[in-house]
């Protein structure tokens, strides 16, 4: 079962995108949108590669944040008028293992982390 987190507020998409980049210390986000000045009220978030859920997210939100958005999925969302932010697969998931390690550090466990950074570099 996939849980879609819904966040409710009112902001212009462009303002939200800039705030998100600052808070998460990310230089670039891939944005699929017909109108960046339109206000959003609900944001849906699923980490990792979750574009297969964009139609469900569209029913419940104005903006969907996920990772690994493929070209044809992005085109379908754009043509339907839905707004998507592609956060990147690694970028949307690395917080999880950092939190998990912090929570379990006192359990005398050894952690093997195979992916310590994003695979793709942007220049």
Segments and roles (model prediction):
Residues 1-123:
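Active-site catalytic microenvironments in core metabolic enzymes, especially phosphate/sugar-handling
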